[in-house]
């Protein structure tokens, strides 16, 4: 079968891909709490003839091929949504206060589509394709949970690929941007800072210790790390995303809790940032007669892309979609007049897989601003062009089959 025939076969399943995606979009779950999604994906795989196995807290694994000896190619899709109400103008919007605002419903639908293609061509697969349906990417816990449960073993994975759709890119839907070799996504760490004071009546602040004032100064102080303690080359982002404290306008509360994330590309910078955040928060709190406790929660390392796998992937996608539908990030940037592609500031827990086996991450354009896809990921009004679904499913399946055939 030619690449063109393979693409046409993928396009013939477009209606089913859209049906899958819209069900998943309308029934989102978050973190590991994705029962509706899990049940749907499992049933679809069984109906195709797979024998899906649960992996970790809420993951699924299925195998295609295995009839011929060869290597193992892992394809990964994340399944979780975000804890935010949807405002997108679509008929299939979610109504449960959660939303697929990052496109994970698209990823899951595409991998189901790839599973359908792989099953139809199972006798042609040299080796095995392992399908990884993963929960809890948004909290950076799902990938590592599945790794600890053995997703990369039995059979042992040789290489891995993930796709992430991107809305609002000025590129035709279905254009693939393949990460170059090296680090493409930063390490990420969630943190909380609990500032403990002493509550009192708002008219008599002298009788208490105001944690809100201390927290405000801590927020300001933390910004000085980047401004005055990191070198220009020390790429890092520190964001406070939540502030919780108090319940009445005339009462100074006992405590305030801040929450946020840090993103870094270098482990030394990551460690330094954590140390200084703790020192600054504790020091400022003490100066206001309060105390501060800094804790770091879930996170993920940097995502490292394999240069050889990147080159192969670009070549395969060009066979499938054409020369103008696949670029490395550096190639795309050179076309725009810049010499080097900027790194993304968004983290991705597929990084855990990339630390274990040669891996590649690619972005798939899913709607231009001119066509009305003007909101970014994580926005309550974001929408994705479903025309990317068939192309994404074809990329998943074709890339795996081509790589396996060349590396038997």
Where are these regions (language model features)?
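Non-cysteine beta-strand/loop elements that form the S-adenosyl-L-methionine
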Residues: 76, 191-193, 361-366
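General structural feature for long, well-ordered alpha-helical segments within catalytic domains
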Residues: 2, 13-20, 33-44, 71, ...
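Acidic/His- and Gly-rich active-site-bordering loop/insert found
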Residues: 2-100, 105, 109-126
């Amino acid at each position: 079968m030619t690449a063109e025939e393979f693409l046409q076969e993928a396009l013939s399943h477009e209606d089913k891909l859209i049906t899958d995606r819209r069900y998943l979009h309308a029934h989102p779950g978050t973190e590991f709490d994705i029962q509706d999604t899990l049940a749907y994906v499992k049933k679809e795989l069984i109906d195709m003839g797979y024998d899906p196995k649960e992996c970790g807290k809420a993951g699924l694994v299925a195998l295609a091929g295995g009839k011929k000896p060869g290597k193992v190619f892992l394809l990964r899709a994340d399944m979780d949504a975000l804890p935010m109400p949807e405002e997108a103008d679509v008929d299939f919007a979610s109504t449960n206060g959660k939303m697929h605002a990052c496109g994970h419903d698209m990823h899951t639908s595409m991998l189901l589509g790839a599973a359908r293609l792989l099953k139809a061509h199972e006798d042609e697969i040299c080796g095995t394709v392992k399908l990884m349906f993963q929960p809890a990417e948004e909290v950076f816990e799902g990938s590592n949970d599945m790794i600890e449960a053995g997703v990369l073993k039995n059979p042992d994975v040789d290489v891995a690929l993930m796709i992430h759709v991107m809305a609002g890119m000025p590129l035709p839907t279905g254009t693939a941007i393949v990460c170059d070799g090296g680090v493409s996504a930063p390490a990420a760490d969630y943190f909380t800072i609990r500032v403990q004071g002493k509550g009192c009546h708002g008219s008599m602040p002298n009788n208490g210790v105001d944690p809100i004032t201390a927290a405000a100064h801590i927020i300001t102080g933390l910004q000085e790390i980047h401004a005055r303690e990191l070198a220009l080359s020390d790429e890092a982002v520190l964001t406070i995303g939540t502030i919780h404290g108090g319940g009445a306008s005339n009462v100074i509360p006992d405590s305030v809790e801040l929450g946020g994330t840090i993103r870094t590309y270098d482990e030394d910078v990551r460690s330094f940032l954590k140390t200084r955040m703790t020192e600054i928060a504790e020091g400022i709190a003490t100066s206001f007669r309060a105390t501060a406790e800094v804790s770091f929660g879930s996170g993920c390392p940097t995502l490292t892309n394999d240069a050889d796998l990147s080159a192969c992937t670009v070549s395969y996608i060009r066979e499938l979609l054409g020369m103008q539908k696949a670029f490395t990030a550096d190639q795309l940037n050179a076309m725009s007049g810049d010499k080097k592609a900027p790194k993304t500031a968004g983290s991705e827990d597929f990084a855990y897989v990339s630390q274990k086996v040669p891996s590649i991450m690619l972005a798939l354009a899913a709607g231009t601003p001119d066509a009305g896809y003007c909101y970014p990921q994580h926005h309550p009004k974001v929408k994705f062009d479903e025309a990317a679904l068939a192309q994404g499913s074809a990329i998943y399946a074709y890339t795996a089959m081509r790589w396996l055939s060349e590396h038997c």
